[in-house]
């Protein structure tokens, strides 16, 4: 006893307080676990688990109400695949505690407003859907939900707002109807008919210029590539025609109907959609990806038709599972294969279709590409007897439809397939694709196989690739990735610069300094120099050729050796590549040396940009140069260009961030300054203001470079496409060659992959390049891009 009293006297009973805090934290963690895990595998039925959990939460409401409210709002937003489980739980709590139900509805409306304000429109859709399902659980009165949807659809009447804003509010309304349409129509049929009429009127008049840019395939056979709102409208129309009967949504609240129907309902507070502002960023439109139908799995359960609302519900739930668990591939795969009602549908077909729908989504997949590869590998391990066969069937279908597949999606298909093969000993029935051997090498199928084998080599080695494919495929196999050194054999003795190359080789091996290399290069004659030009500073292609060829040849052992060589002789590179022609020639020579090793080319270009040996505009000009025309449609070329653009964008963002931080620091300094005359503060302000001025200049310079890079790229695209179109018109041949398809879709790809940056320069692009006089084929791409956020 005395020990306890001594403790109480000395620290005021703190251990007791800590114990109370610890107990409270444990209880909160326990509540979080119970709420998050409800609906997962359990010995008891879902209904009894929900009833038990409602009892536990009700008992804890007096002490943990705010925590419970916060948790339920969070799961409504983040676990949409368990939507009806949580709405039932809220319904049971509302039946037991009416005030809590009201507070929950208010909290959800607050969260919805915050999500819309923060441009979290995808989460806002789930919140709207959750609120609508609360009508089924007798938490929210149907008339107030109808009034909210009426306000949503009234956005279609707004003037001077982007179409994507109107689209989102229509989508939020339509996508909730599979859950609540029946209940709303029973209670308020006249009002619902009016909302439907307004929706139909809007859908008929909205523009769909953007659709070609977002389609995975240009052909509509065997499956139409429908715009997402058109497809959803058709599904809802069919559902309405079927008297709102759907057979796939889990509705646990039906088991509690006798309890829930006695509960008092809440009216939603009047909800006015927040007005459009300059900062509003709405989701882009989409095109619905279709790959399978009921004929693809004749023996299993029937796959719902493309305009069946069950197809929408299943796909939506699978997308939600991936969204919730994409960071944990094992959990994600397990959740997908244990999907409720899996025995009623061909689940593996749905899973594979949904994963490819995300992987091929334009402009970008929801998650990083490699996630889909690892998820499919995990699914193959979980379902070894069935899923690999469906995946092989899907791969075959994609291969068969390569002729009309969007080039960006072909790139992703190449990257996925090569990575997938590397995890399964590169086993594939290549003979089944031997039809590609008799086709034009530039047509999509042989091109696809060549690119896949090249990517496989990056994940393996050259001889392994030769061993895995039949000898008949040798023409499509990648070249041996060795260095080509033009001064290396006896026949090169007569080449200009040969003797200097030998001297350089000796100097490099002797660990020569930059000055010693300059001394050796000093006497290299300049084929471009006039006899009366004594300056010696003009661009000297031979000097660059001898130096770059010899250095890269001696450093060819590995990436690391090459990087070390660039670093050691950085000063020489910078001097030789001082002019724009010099930078371009360094890239040309590097390409000649490593022509057979695309990966080495990519990493060397990356390193040269980072170390400022070449700039981004030089890389863009090199890619569109005549020297690269033979390789212009190869994947590695476009990977280099996109990597170059990303580097430029990161550079601009980095300086902008530094400027913002400096401005914030100055603002904080002003705030802290006392009323006294503090001269040291003035001095600090002066230093910061100078720094801000310098950073402002750097930002403007970087943005100018960024704009110039895009101008160079688009200008070169316009030039080569115009040349092709004129040539075809002159010769009387078809414009639609494999080269043209690839090139015009690469132009689309630039717009899509960098849309957020390019939108800053739209006025400049429209005034300087994409003018009304431009050929309609090229101008159409720009117009499609403009329509994406119109």
Curated annotation (Swiss-Prot):
Annotated GO MF terms: molecular adaptor activity; mRNA binding; RNA 7-methylguanosine cap binding; RNA binding; RNA cap binding
Superkingdom: Eukaryota
Record note on quaternary structure: Component of the nuclear cap-binding complex (CBC), a heterodimer composed of NCBP1/CBP80 and NCBP2/CBP20 that interacts with m7GpppG-capped RNA. Found in a U snRNA export complex containing PHAX/RNUXA, NCBP1/CBP80, NCBP2/CBP20, RAN, XPO1 and m7G-capped RNA. Identified in a IGF2BP1-dependent mRNP granule complex containing untranslated mRNAs. Interacts with PHAX/RNUXA, SRRT/ARS2, EIF4G2, IGF2BP1, HNRNPF, HNRNPH1, KIAA0427/CTIF, PARN, DROSHA, UPF1 and ALYREF/THOC4.
Biological process annotations from GO: 7-methylguanosine mRNA capping; alternative mRNA splicing, via spliceosome; cap-dependent translational initiation; defense response to virus; histone mRNA metabolic process; miRNA-mediated post-transcriptional gene silencing; mRNA 3'-end processing; mRNA export from nucleus
Family to which the UniProt record says this protein belongs: Belongs to the NCBP1 family.
Stated name of the protein: Nuclear cap-binding protein subunit 1
Region annotation Disordered: where it falls in the sequence: 1-26
Coiled coil: 643-713
Organism: Homo sapiens
Pfam family, one: MIF4G_like
Keyword vocabulary terms for this entry: Acetylation, Coiled coil, Cytoplasm, Isopeptide bond, mRNA capping, mRNA processing, mRNA splicing, mRNA transport, Nonsense-mediated mRNA decay, Nucleus, Phosphoprotein, RNA-mediated gene silencing, Translation regulation, Transport, Ubl conjugation
């Amino acid at each position: 006893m005395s020990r306890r009293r001594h403790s109480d006297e000395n620290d005021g009973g703190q251990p007791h307080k800590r114990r109370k805090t610890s107990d409270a934290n444990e209880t909160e963690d326990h509540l979080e676990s119970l709420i998050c895990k409800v609906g997962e595998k359990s010995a008891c039925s879902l209904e009894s688990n929900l009833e038990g959990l409602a009892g536990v939460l009700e008992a804890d409401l007096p002490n943990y109400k705010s925590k419970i409210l916060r948790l339920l709002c969070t799961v409504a937003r983040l676990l949409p695949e368990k939507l009806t489980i949580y709405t039932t739980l809220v319904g049971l709590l509302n039946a037991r505690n009416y005030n809590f139900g009201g507070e929950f509805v208010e909290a959800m409306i607050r969260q919805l407003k915050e999500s819309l304000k923060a441009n979290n429109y995808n989460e806002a859709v789930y919140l709207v859907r959750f609120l609508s399902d609360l009508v089924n659980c007798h938490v929210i009165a149907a008339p107030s939900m109808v009034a909210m949807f009426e306000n949503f659809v009234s956005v279609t009447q707004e003037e001077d707002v982007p179409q994507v804003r109107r689209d989102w509010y229509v989508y939020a309304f339509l996508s909730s109807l599979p859950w609540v349409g029946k209940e709303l129509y029973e209670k308020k049929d006249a009002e619902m008919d009016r909302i439907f009429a307004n929706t139909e009127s809007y859908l008929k008049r909205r523009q769909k210029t953007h659709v070609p840019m977002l389609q995975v395939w240009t052909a509509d056979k065997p499956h139409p590539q429908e715009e997402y709102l058109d497809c959803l409208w058709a599904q809802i129309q069919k559902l309405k025609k079927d008297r709102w009967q759907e057979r796939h949504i889990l509705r646990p609240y039906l088991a509690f109907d006798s309890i829930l129907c006695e509960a008092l309902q809440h009216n939603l507070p009047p909800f006015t959609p927040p007005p459009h502002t300059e900062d509003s960023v709405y989701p882009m439109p989409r095109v619905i990806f279709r790959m399978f139908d009921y004929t693809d799995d004749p023996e299993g359960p029937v796959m719902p038709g493309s305009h069946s609302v069950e197809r929408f519900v299943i796909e939506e739930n699978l997308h939600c599972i991936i969204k919730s668990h994409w960071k944990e591939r094992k959990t994600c795969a397990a959740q997908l294969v244990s999907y409720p009602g899996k025995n009623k549908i061909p689940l593996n077909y749905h899973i594979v279709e949904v994963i490819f729908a995300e992987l091929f989504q334009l402009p970008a997949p929801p998650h990083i590409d490699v996630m889909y590869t690892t998820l499919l590998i995990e699914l193959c391990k979980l379902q070894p007897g069935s899923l690999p066969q469906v995946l092989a069937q899907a791969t075959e279908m994609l291969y068969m439809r390569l002729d009309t597949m969007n080039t960006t999606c072909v790139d992703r298909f190449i990257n996925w397939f090569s990575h997938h093969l590397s995890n399964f000993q590169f086993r594939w029935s290549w003979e089944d694709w031997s039809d590609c051997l008799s086709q034009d090498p530039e047509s999509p199928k042989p091109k696809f196989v060549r690119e896949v084998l090249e990517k496989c080599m990056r994940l393996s080695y050259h001889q392994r690739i030769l061993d895995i494919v039949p000898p008949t495929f040798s023409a499509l196999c990648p070249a041996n990735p060795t260095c080509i050194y033009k001064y290396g054999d006896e026949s090169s003795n007569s080449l200009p610069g040969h003797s200097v190359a030998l001297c350089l080789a000796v100097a490099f091996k002797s660990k020569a300094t930059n000055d010693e290399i300059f001394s050796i290069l000093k006497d290299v004659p300049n084929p471009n120099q006039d006899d009366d030009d004594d300056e010696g500073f003009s661009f000297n292609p031979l000097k660059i050729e001898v130096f770059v060829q010899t250095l890269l040849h001696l450093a060819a052992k590995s990436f690391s050796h090459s990087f070390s060589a660039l670093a050691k002789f950085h000063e020489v590179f910078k001097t030789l590549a001082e002019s724009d022609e010099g930078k371009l020639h360094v890239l040309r020579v590097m390409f000649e040396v490593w022509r057979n090793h695309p990966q080495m080319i990519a990493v060397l270009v990356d390193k040269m940009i980072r170390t400022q040996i070449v700039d981004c505009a030089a890389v863009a000009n090199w890619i569109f140069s005549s020297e690269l025309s033979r390789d212009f449609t190869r994947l590695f070329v476009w990977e280099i260009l996109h990597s170059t653009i990303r580097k430029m964008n990161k550079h601009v963002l980095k300086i902008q961030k530094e400027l913002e931080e400096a401005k914030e620091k100055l603002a904080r300094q002003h705030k802290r300054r006392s009323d006294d005359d503090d001269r040291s503060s003035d001095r600090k302000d002066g230093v910061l203001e100078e720094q801000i001025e310098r950073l402002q200049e750097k930002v403007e310079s970087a943005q100018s470079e960024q704009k110039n890079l895009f101008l160079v790229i688009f200008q070169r695209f316009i030039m080569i496409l115009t040349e092709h179109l004129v040539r075809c018109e002159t010769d009387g041949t078809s414009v639609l060659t494999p080269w043209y398809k690839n090139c015009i879709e690469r132009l689309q790809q630039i717009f899509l992959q960098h849309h957020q940056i390019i939108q800053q320069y739209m006025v400049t692009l429209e005034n300087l390049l994409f003018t009304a006089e431009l050929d309609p084929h090229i101008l159409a791409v720009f117009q499609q891009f403009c329509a994406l956020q119109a």
